[in-house]
A protein has these predicted regions:
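Hydrophobic alpha-helical and helix-loop surface patches within well-folded domains
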Residues: 180, 208-462, 466-467
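A surface-exposed beta-strand-loop module
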Residues: 35, 54-56, 61-116, 137, ...
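N-terminal, polar/Ser/Thr-rich
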Residues: 1-42, 114-119, 123, 130, ...
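Surface-exposed beta-strand/loop patches in extracellular or lumenal glycoproteins
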Residues: 46-64, 134-137, 143-152, 423, ...
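Beta-strand-rich binding/interaction modules
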Residues: 65-71, 436-439, 449-531, 642, ...
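Short acidic/polar inter-strand loop motif in beta-rich domains
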Residues: 102-109, 474-475, 534-540
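Long, ordered, helix-rich scaffold segments
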Residues: 354, 381, 520-862
Length: 862
């Protein structure tokens, strides 16, 4: 089916930012009562509504039928207009009471109220509350919630909701109740409840003003011992937010609940955060060092939302980056303060380049403040979150720490208790700093990753260097013509002979398509270090030679720039090898050797610096992606690095064993570098490689060492590989989170038979279609494995298409997140592109597609 020629009469209508209108009715107070049962939950809502404009009361619903509707205690006339319940109200203030019945255990979408592993829990962002109760389900309607939960005490002994617990008691027939009150107005997407048999890790935090906050992390009894790290992270984040942003917690209780089935990573519901269990549970036997970091980051992120998202929320969903971009920036700052800021910056940029840059360069490109959507859940993207954070970071760089803090204080003071816009945030920054951010607003309006070309000329007799910058913002869907965007570029010059910085670092504001900067008093040939610290989310193109990049990888005093020089040297070499098959690998090998030998570098940084770029990122550097050529070049360089430096890798592997099982930063860094060394030893083809990895697996005292060994073995065809995977499954068969690693490691394996393995795993008894974590670990991981997904047979495309269709019937939101890898069809060679496009068309022709998947498919086809 070609959507260019076939009519789309049933296509859902888009929602437009330009059509925003304030709500006609506000709901300052709502009382909810839940009679909880997995098969049949009765919900009663009492809405105090106040007129704010002209028109009837319209309440959103999704799959709901009203059992009764009363206005001011009297049965009322009402009608359904699509999914909206409409009531004509004569006056300006009324009490509307509505009763509905819902079935949580039948809710496989995991939006609204649903059942998960014996619990009842909610997910309401973005539009899940309308699956619970008829309500103006939009973020600019803020209400104070009073909630009563009633349930069977034996089955659901713990009853939690937002705010403060105010009462509880027993009822006849073995039932009980709990009453919760949230004194702070909040939008419906922040409502939450959890009911179940849970154990709690309790602690407390004393705020700067002396208030004692009760903290609770609620999990299954057998998981209680794995919550200590999350609790420590929560208390650390609370103290950090007071110190860095002046934000103090406002309720008397803060609860976190871990659930097994969850579409997102976590949710910042006021006072009752609900988390995917993978971001709560951690101990050395089941969680890698990376998992520990993820738990700390996500706990902090959701806590920080209490101010940047809850106390000040979004006017409409087009403003989503207002809360998410700002909060990601805040959690990045926090994580950088807890460990190595350099390594954290490298990790953040790697994620941006792997997820957001391709999004910005494909059919799903959108600004951080979009102009339209069909299904808002499709805009919980790397652009909104990660690029949004980079836009905030640029403001921080341009204004400076003090002015940025003044701007954030003003923003919170002005808009506390209201629904704000991205414009409100920028205006607060302008007003507090006196800095004109007029042109900077282009970052909110324009999609696409700017490309900046930098050329440095040196006039030796005159002692001058001239830097010429040229910016291009590529066309994206719906935006063919772009303006140049202002950006801060941190720049330094290093002497080629002295190896030292020739001038202090400068922050250059590139605010046009072309710009020249003159440097005086330059006594030797300068080497350009640009976009230091990744000060702007752009692609830099320069005339720096391999020798220049190798020089910077050894001498640049900005850790990110040093890492970036090594990465660019690798990328240039690999791109050359893709084209010629005979690139000179010696400069890369020498640069890696020098980095390994530098005693001044922390092991965690070295581990990042010597890793090859992802194959997918390498493909992004090419006009047309040839996956097989990329794989050949990548394998050649990886093998050469392993073989030529085998003695170095063995030395590193032995030396880094001193890190042991320590969870301190030094031990974690040593484990990371030791794992990288093991990977290169195995890639070298050394006869003892598989045996070395298997020995590490068997002796491992941490999941990090065990997972590293398993990953190294995954690329081999060896008896050791088969034995290790069998042993891993046997050991962790009853731990769903760890078993996700078993699936994911095989799906990501750089092997020619990975498609066979993945198809077999999709039939494995432990593959559960209803669990988003399991789907992401197998299907999602496979789709980003460039060499396996793009198997020339096209089997990878068919597998993903079949999965999207099957999952869409269960969980449309998760299904839609799997479409983008197929949507990049125009970037690949003709044969692959045709197969990918055909698969998109086949899936689009499926009857009964959700609007979530329809939007992704239709945009991907163009």
């Amino acid at each position: 089916m070609d959507i260019r020629t076939q009519p789309l009469a049933a296509a859902p209508a888009p929602v437009l930012r330009a059509d925003y209108a304030p709500p006609v009715w506000q709901v300052p107070e709502i009382a909810l009562e839940f009679d909880l049962d997995p098969a049949r939950t009765q919900v009663t809502g009492r809405l105090s509504v106040v007129r704010a404009g002209d028109g009837p009361l319209r309440l959103d619903g999704d799959g709901l039928t009203a059992d009764s509707v009363m206005v001011d205690g009297v049965a009322a006339d009402w009608a359904m207009d699509g999914d909206q319940l409409v009531v004509d109200l004569p006056g300006n203030a009324h009490l509307v009471e509505i009763r509905v019945t819902i079935a949580p255990e039948a809710n496989t979408q995991l939006m609204g109220l649903y059942a998960s592993d014996g619990l009842l829990c909610t997910q309401c962002e973005a539009e899940g509350f309308r699956r619970i109760m008829f309500f103006p389900d939009r973020p600019d309607v803020l209400a104070r919630y009073a909630v009563r939960l009633v349930a069977d005490r034996a089955r659901y002994p713990v009853l939690l909701s937002n705010g403060d617990h105010v009462d509880s008691g027993t009822l006849p027939d073995g039932r009980h109740y709990a009453d919760w009150r949230d004194p702070f107005p909040k939008p419906s997407y922040l409502f939450a409840l959890v009911a179940g048999d849970l154990a709690v890790n309790r602690d407390s935090f004393v705020t700067g003003s002396g208030k004692v906050v009760e903290l609770g992390i609620w999990v299954r009894e057998h998981d209680l011992g794995r919550t200590g790290h999350a609790m420590h992270a929560l208390k650390t984040a609370m103290a950090w937010d007071e110190r860095v942003y002046g934000r103090e917690y406002d309720l008397g209780v803060f609860n976190i609940v871990a659930v097994s089935d969850f579409n997102f990573g976590a949710m910042e519901n006021k006072g009752l955060n609900i988390f995917n269990s993978r971001y709560v549970l951690a101990d050395p036997d089941t969680a890698t060092d990376q998992d520990y970091d993820a738990v700390a980051t996500v706990v902090a992120h959701e806590y920080f939302h209490n101010w940047s998202g809850n106390r000040v929320t979004c006017r409409d969903w087009f403003q989503l980056s207002l809360k998410e971009g700002f909060t990601v920036f805040r959690d990045q700052q926090y994580s950088a303060d807890q460990g190595s800021a350099a390594v954290k910056r490298i990790e953040d940029v790697r994620v941006l380049r792997a997820a957001q840059f391709p999004e910005d360069g494909g059919p799903l490109a959108h600004p951080i403040r979009p102009d339209s959507y069909i299904e808002i859940s499709n805009f919980y993207t790397a652009t909104i979150y990660n690029k949004g954070a980079e836009v905030i970071r640029m403001m921080h760089t341009m204004l400076g720490e003090a002015a940025f803090r003044a701007g954030s204080d003003l923003y919170f003071d002005r808009h506390d208790g209201t629904a704000a816009t991205c414009e409100d945030f920028v205006a607060a920054m302008e007003d507090a700093s006196g800095h004109d951010l007029g042109l900077f607003r282009l970052w909110y309006r324009q999609a696409g990753t700017p490309r900046v070309h930098a050329a440095l000329d040196f006039d030796a007799p005159g002692g001058r260097a001239r830097l010429r910058l040229q910016q291009v913002v590529p066309a994206t869907p719906g935006q063919p013509d772009k303006q140049a965007m202002p950006m801060p570029l941190r720049i330094a010059l290093f002497g080629e002979v002295s190896g030292t910085k020739l001038l202090p670092e400068q922050t250059v504001m590139l605010d046009g398509a072309h710009q020249e900067i003159l440097f005086e008093g330059i006594g030797e040939r300068p080497v350009l270090s640009i976009n230091r610290g990744f000060s702007a989310p752009v692609t830099i193109e320069s005339d720096r030679s391999a020798a220049d990049l190798a020089f910077l990888s050894a001498h640049d005093d900005d850790p990110f720039a040093r890492y970036e020089a090594m990465q660019q040297l690798m990328v240039d070499t690999l791109v050359d090898d893709v084209a010629t098959g005979n690139a000179d690998l010696a400069p890369v090998i020498a640069a890696v050797k020098a980095t390994l030998a530098d005693p001044a570098l922390e092991p965690a940084f070295v581990a990042e610096a010597v890793l090859l770029p992802f194959e997918a990122y390498l493909g992004d550097q090419m006009p047309v992606v040839d996956p097989q050529a990329v794989t050949r070049a990548w394998d050649r360089l990886r093998g050469a690095l392993g073989a030529e430096l085998i003695a170095d890798w063995r030395g590193v592997y032995a030396g880094m064993a001193a890190g042991g099982n320590s969870l301190e930063a030094a031990g974690r860094g040593m484990r990371r570098l030791r794992g990288v060394a093991l990977g290169y030893i195995v890639a070298s083809g050394a006869a003892d490689g598989p045996a070395l990895a298997k020995a590490q697996y068997e002796a491992a005292g941490t999941m990090t060492d065990r997972q590293t060994a398993l990953t190294a073995l995954a690329m081999t065809a060896s008896a050791e590989r088969d034995a290790a995977f069998a042993a891993f499954h046997a050991r962790y068969a009853d731990n769903a989170l760890v078993l996700d690693k078993w699936f994911q490691t095989q799906a990501l394996a750089p092997r020619s038979d990975t498609i066979d393995v993945v198809e077999r795993l999709a039939r494995h008894p432990d593959f559960v279609m209803t669990n988003p974590n399991r789907l992401r670990s197998l299907v999602g991981a496979f789709a980003v494995n460039q060499r396996a997904f793009h198997d020339p047979s096209g089997r990878g495309y068919r597998f993903l298409g079949d999965m999207v269709v099957a999952i869409d019937r269960i969980n449309p939101q998760t299904a839609a997140k799997l479409v983008p890898p197929l949507g990049r069809w125009s970037r690949f060679d003709a044969a692959r592109g045709a197969m990918m496009r055909a698969e998109l068309e086949r899936v689009l022709g499926t009857e009964g597609l959700s609007k979530d998947v329809f939007e992704q498919l239709s945009k991907s086809l163009g």
